[in-house]
Swiss-Prot record:
The gene is CYP3A7. GO terms for biological process: estrogen metabolic process; lipid hydroxylation; oxidative demethylation; retinoic acid metabolic process; retinol metabolic process; steroid biosynthetic process; steroid metabolic process; xenobiotic metabolic process. InterPro entries: Cyt_P450, Cyt_P450_CS, Cyt_P450_E_CYP3A, Cyt_P450_E_grp-II, Cyt_P450_sf, Cytochrome_P450_3A. It catalyses: an organic molecule + reduced [NADPH--hemoprotein reductase] + O2 = an alcohol + oxidized [NADPH--hemoprotein reductase] + H2O + H(+); 3beta-hydroxyandrost-5-en-17-one + reduced [NADPH--hemoprotein reductase] + O2 = 3beta,16alpha-dihydroxy-androst-5-en-17-one + oxidized [NADPH--hemoprotein reductase] + H2O + H(+); dehydroepiandrosterone 3-sulfate + reduced [NADPH--hemoprotein reductase] + O2 = 16alpha-hydroxydehydroepiandrosterone 3-sulfate + oxidized [NADPH--hemoprotein reductase] + H2O + H(+); testosterone + reduced [NADPH--hemoprotein reductase] + O2 = 6beta,17beta-dihydroxyandrost-4-en-3-one + oxidized [NADPH--hemoprotein reductase] + H2O + H(+). It is a peripheral membrane protein. One of its GO terms (molecular function) is iron ion binding. A cytochrome P450 monooxygenase involved in the metabolism of steroid hormones and vitamins during embryogenesis. Mechanistically, uses molecular oxygen inserting one oxygen atom into a substrate, and reducing the second into a water molecule, with two electrons provided by NADPH via cytochrome P450 reductase (NADPH--hemoprotein reductase). Catalyzes the hydroxylation of carbon-hydrogen bonds. Metabolizes 3beta-hydroxyandrost-5-en-17-one (dehydroepiandrosterone, DHEA), a precursor in the biosynthesis of androgen and estrogen steroid hormones. This is Cytochrome P450 3A7. It comes from Homo sapiens. Belongs to the cytochrome P450 family. It is an enzyme of class 1 (oxidoreductase). SUPFAM superfamilies: Cytochrome P450. Keywords: Endoplasmic reticulum, Heme, Iron, Lipid biosynthesis, Lipid metabolism, Membrane, Metal-binding, Microsome, Monooxygenase, Oxidoreductase, Steroid biosynthesis. Pathway: Steroid hormone biosynthesis; Cofactor metabolism; retinol metabolism. Its cofactor is heme.
Amino acid sequence: MDLIPNLAVETWLLLAVSLILLYLYGTRTHGLFKKLGIPGPTPLPFLGNALSFRKGYWTFDMECYKKYRKVWGIYDCQQPMLAITDPDMIKTVLVKECYSVFTNRRPFGPVGFMKNAISIAEDEEWKRIRSLLSPTFTSGKLKEMVPIIAQYGDVLVRNLRREAETGKPVTLKHVFGAYSMDVITSTSFGVSIDSLNNPQDPFVENTKKLLRFNPLDPFVLSIKVFPFLTPILEALNITVFPRKVISFLTKSVKQIKEGRLKETQKHRVDFLQLMIDSQNSKDSETHKALSDLELMAQSIIFIFAGYETTSSVLSFIIYELATHPDVQQKVQKEIDTVLPNKAPPTYDTVLQLEYLDMVVNETLRLFPVAMRLERVCKKDVEINGMFIPKGVVVMIPSYVLHHDPKYWTEPEKFLPERFSKKNKDNIDPYIYTPFGSGPRNCIGMRFALVNMKLALVRVLQNFSFKPCKETQIPLKLRFGGLLLTEKPIVLKAESRDETVSGA
């Protein structure tokens, strides 16, 4: 029996031509960096270097930096990406040429009306939305939001005490994930939830579904391999965000907004109310006010941007304090001095906690949750003698720069003193970029820092943390869109009044 089908010569020829054309399509961008004389790892047809990302962006970027040093070119499937590590070049990309060339973040497939969200919007639309939202994140507005956040700090302490009193070690992501969820749903949607004790709440269920995003998901990969699918999927109303979840959240925002507009009494200050106010503000005459669809997109993106990042960083901070008891005691002493007798923290008192600020900054250096910053090159440009073609994504490997011995003595060590007043001025702002830099940095940076510090103060006023036999030391990281641990961080929590866990 013939193993090879008896096909006509024309059929074989057609098949061969089809395979050649398919190969050419799958490698059409892969010669760019070689042509430009930029080194980098060899890409595979269609997938580029994407399979190497499975070991973790941080590992792959570290390997490339050690091998190629200053710049290198990689391919995320079909997308050429230029990694840069020179602080002058980084400043040019993030600041000097932000508005003219490097305005936009990298698009990631069909997003539907979420294209209006501040972290996804492009060019003039992004500038307009950023201008409208910036007043929402002023220190004055954040100060007014502190009572809402503080309320969930108290819930966090109660939940942590309940977990600790079982005598079992505490899984930090469990309690900090609930805190992060509560604060974000409260400030973005005006919804009060104790999510740890109400896991069936539709807001909790839907927001958790929204956050299950995997960069190596077959659907996401197919869009990267065949980018022409994006407009087709957009036309079919298929997006990377789960349809049912988006439908639930948009309906919720609409109902909450309508309810608030009907009420006559003064509303509490949260992001949702501030955005509603901006729609009716006379000050918005210079820019077209936020539409209802844009308002919904911001509320949803706040969850996407804030939930995982806040809960992960809080977990990393407490882990570092547990494994460095001298630092933990020093932080607690500072908190007890500024806020005696467990006095509730305020916006102003949190800003007085200099050593706590050093601890937070050092943890963000060791664990920059986003790992990379990315900007799309809008037109052919030359920067510091290097030609960058239109369409290339310029990538700044934050994790690599945060761990580079060229800039940090003993970079793998947890040393909060790096960020003391004396040393802080020596830190290059284009090497240390936990929230990005320039006009398109993280708009919620101040909110995130205040939110985390309020939680840390309440927790450290009431508890001390120690490693236990289940604690993974040193921490191992796993692949994900953000910096995640291989195993959940588990610690022993002890009440500062009396030992309540695992003693």
